[in-house]
Design a protein with these regions (language model features):
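Divalent metal-binding pocket/active-site signature
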Residues: 1-26, 69-72, 108
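Generic hydrophobic/aromatic pocket-lining and core-packing "Φ" positions
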Residues: 2, 17-18, 53, 114, ...
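Loop/turn elements at helix/coil->beta-strand transitions in domains of secreted/extracellular proteins
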Residues: 6-9, 24, 57-62, 119-123, ...
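Short hydrophobic/aromatic-enriched beta-strand-loop microsegments
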Residues: 27-38, 150, 200
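Active-site neighborhoods of metal-dependent hydrolases
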Residues: 34-146, 155, 217-222
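Acidic, glycine-enriched loop/beta-strand segments at the rims
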Residues: 134, 145, 149-154, 162-197
Length: 222
């Protein structure tokens, strides 16, 4: 599979660690979880072995942590977001699950694994594995909480994944493809500002958050 993907010029990703690195896989998904074949967990009881971060880093693989459960921490730090209309896009069961998460869950092991991979040479890219739009902002906040600078966290959601996926995007420059979020605040000083979206420019069209949440955006003529 890896050889075929690479022959097509496509990066390959999976849930694996050791077999993936050995076979030349480009990326690994999720900071927790297994290969789904009952072995090769990245973390056990909130901790990971050093060889996990060493192998991923030495192979210069990309890792997408998908820290969706930490949305509770994000909402605790920024309580005004609990009434954000974008949360209404979540299915009720998922919203209830997130809002009833443990108030003081210990993510120190998760933080150590993410930063160990990053410092060992791995590339961290922001992804959520969750449908709602708030999760990405929570993901970026987690990276800063773990030790990244806001600039590094922003790159994890823009230039780094664009480079990994070989997309002509991820930066604002002549000739590049770019959807642009207009936010209130300076994310380079406070990463939570990324959640203060006021307008979005996508495919040359400008939308408000209300347009996107209500579904009006899909009816807007090109």
């Amino acid at each position: 599979i890896v050889d075929f993907a690479h022959a097509m010029g496509v990066p390959a990703s999976s849930h694996e660690i050791y077999p993936a690195a050995f076979d030349g896989m480009d990326s690994v998904e999720h900071v927790e979880g297994t290969s789904r074949r009952g072995y090769s967990p990245k973390m056990t009881l909130g901790r990971s072995y050093q060889d996990v971060s060493t192998i991923i880093g030495a192979a210069h693989m990309t890792m997408t942590p998908t820290l969706g459960p930490r949305l509770y921490d994000f909402l605790t730090k920024h309580p005004q977001m609990r009434n954000d209309p974008r949360l209404a896009l979540d299915p009720p069961w998922l919203k209830q699950q997130i809002l009833s998460a443990p108030a003081h869950a210990d993510y120190s092991g998760t933080a150590k694994l993410v930063m160990d991979v990053y410092r060992a040479g791995g590339r961290i890219v922001a992804g959520t594995d969750q449908p709602g739009p708030i999760y990405l902002h929570s993901e970026l906040q987690s990276y800063v909480d773990f030790g990244m600078s806001p600039y590094e966290a922003l790159r994890a959601a823009t230039a780094v994944p664009a480079g990994f996926l070989q997309l002509d995007a991820g930066v604002i420059a002549p000739g590049k493809l770019a959807d642009i979020d207009l936010v209130e605040g300076n994310p380079l000083e406070d990463i939570a500002s990324t959640a203060n979206v006021r307008q979005v420019i996508a495919n040359g069209r400008r939308f408000t958050v209300e347009d996107l949440v209500s579904g009006k955006a899909k009816d807007t003529p090109r």
